[in-house]
Every structure is written in structure tokens, then in C-alpha cells.
């Protein structure tokens, strides 16, 4: 608990009462919420923040955007995967230097660190990025760091140190590839719960990855460093309503000192003159 003058200053800056158990922590519903993240992390008020609303009419076709090489992501025979509830998301940790992504007009090779999910409380919201003002039900982020660095932590404050592949997720047919994750959500009901799961073939989780949007942005959670090359894929992942509901159910299972794990997404940030490009030609009437 903060006391005396420190408490007064904190209230003036954040509008949050000092007795809150979430003081000095960021969150989506408690503590320092997204609109005030800049109080704790000044970078969150930067000019190149993520996510964004991708407006198709403003996207620029770039014929030089290359296809991705994702072949290394199938090397899973002895890769351990840890599924974790970190209090802000469901995260699958996959730290292994052999899991690399090249191509995609990235400035070199990027090593996979983890992937995680953002979702809402209803099907019509949950993704962080939007397309023409529309949310998807969820969004999956594959977080990578340049192979010039040993870790995400080391790379996160360096220009182009990180690259994130973003995938929209909506409701459709049952998706067998997500079974290992869905089945184990019951084992990570509370913050800091984790479980080792069967290693996944990442490319089996992905939709078709030929077409994408590209822009320069930031981490979508504090410290919001503006070091991310963003790729948001055009094609969506589909899971069943039952599978989506298993993520929604995490919002009902928490304990004192943690927030509901639901609606864990940041709203779109201003473009501030940034250009969004794509390798989708016909979609935008380019000749």
C-alpha cells in the first residue's frame, strides 16, 4: 500500500485509489488500465503504437513484399511447449533457436519465443487489430526476436528487434490443431498456472500465409516498445464456438489479486502518418 504524499501523487496521476490491490501494475480491468498505461510506461504514449485499425482503402500495395519461409516451424520432435496463464493472456512458450522464420521481407532471421492470444467476452470483439473497424473474435500473436539477440527481452528496445505475426481467429468448424491447447486450459485456470503440453506444429495452426499486411509498430502491452515489425495475415484461423467458449470461461476463474482473464485486448492506436502495405494486389484494384 502507498502512504502519505506518495499516495496523493499516485491518485493525481492515475485516478486510482491507493488501497487497490492492483496499484503500480498494468491491466485491462483493474490497476492501471490501457488508457493510462503511459503513466507507468511513457513509451505507451508513443507515435508508433499497436494495434491499429487497418483501413483497406488506405493500404498501399507493395510488390516487393516477399513470401515467408516457415519450414523451420515444423521442427517439433523434441521441442517442449509450456502453456501458461500469465494473468494477462494464455501463452505458449516455445523457446528453441531452431524455430526460425525467414523471408517475408524481414531484415534477417527471427527466432520464435512464444505465441499468445487476445479475446473478448462476446464473438464480435476480442482481436486487437481491426479491419475496416471490425473486430474478430480472437487474435493470435507469434512473437519473435532477431537472431542478432539472445532473447525478446534483449531485443525489445531495439529498432526491428522484434517481429510479430498476427492471425485473426473467428468461429467456424472445430479445429483439431488447437485441441492440445483447448484441452489444457482447464489446467491453467489461475494466474501463474502452467502445464507442459505436446509440442505443436505451428504451421498446422496457421491459415494460408501468402497474403498479409505490414507496418511498423509496438508491443501491444507494456512496456509498449516501438520495435516491432508487424505482419497481420489476411486469411483467418477458425475454431468452433465450443473452443472459443473455453477461452471465455477463463474470465470466470480467478482469485484475489488477479483480474478476470477476459477482454484482454488493447484498442487500436492512431497511425500518425505510418504507412500500411500489403502484397494483395487485386484486393485494392492496383493495375
Where are these regions (language model features)?
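Alpha-carbonic anhydrase
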Residues: 2-287
Amino acid at each position: 500500500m502507498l502512504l502519505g504524499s506518495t499516495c496523493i501523487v499516485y491518485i493525481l496521476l492515475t485516478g486510482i485509489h491507493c488501497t487497490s490491490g492492483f496499484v503500480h501494475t498494468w491491466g485491462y480491468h483493474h490497476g492501471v488500465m490501457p488508457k493510462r498505461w503511459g503513466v507507468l510506461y511513457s513509451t505507451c504514449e508513443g507515435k508508433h503504437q499497436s494495434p491499429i485499425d487497418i483501413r483497406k482503402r488506405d493500404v498501399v500495395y507493395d510488390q516487393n513484399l516477399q513470401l515467408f519461409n516457415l519450414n523451420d516451424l515444423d521442427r517439433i520432435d523434441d521441442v517442449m511447449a509450456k502453456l501458461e496463464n500469465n494473468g494477462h493472456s494464455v501463452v505458449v512458450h516455445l523457446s528453441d533457436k531452431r524455430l526460425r522464420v525467414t523471408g517475408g521481407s524481414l531484415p534477417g532471421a527471427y527466432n520464435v519465443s512464444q505465441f499468445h492470444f487476445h479475446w473478448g467476452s462476446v464473438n464480435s470483439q476480442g482481436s486487437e487489430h481491426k479491419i475496416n473497424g471490425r473486430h474478430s473474435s480472437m487474435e493470435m500473436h507469434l512473437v519473435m526476436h532477431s537472431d542478432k539477440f539472445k532473447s525478446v527481452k534483449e531485443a525489445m528496445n531495439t529498432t526491428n528487434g522484434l517481429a510479430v505475426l498476427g492471425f485473426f481467429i473467428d468461429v467456424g468448424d472445430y479445429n483439431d490443431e488447437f485441441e492440445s491447447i483447448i484441452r489444457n486450459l482447464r489446467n491453467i485456470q489461475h494466474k501463474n498456472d502452467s502445464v507442459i503440453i505436446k509440442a505443436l506444429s505451428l504451421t498446422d495452426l496457421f491459415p494460408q500465409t501468402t497474403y498479409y499486411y505490414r507496418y511498423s509498430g509496438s508491443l501491444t502491452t507494456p512496456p509498449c516498445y516501438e520495435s516491432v515489425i508487424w505482419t497481420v495475415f489476411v486469411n483467418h484461423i477458425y475454431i468452433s464456438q465450443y473452443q472459443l467458449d473455453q477461452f471465455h470461461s477463463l474470465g470466470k476463474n480467478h482469485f484475489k489479486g488477479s483480474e478476470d482473464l477476459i477482454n484482454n485486448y488493447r484498442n487500436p492506436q492512431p497511425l500518425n502518418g505510418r504507412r500500411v502495405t500489403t502484397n494483395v494486389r487485386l484486393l485494392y484494384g492496383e493495375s
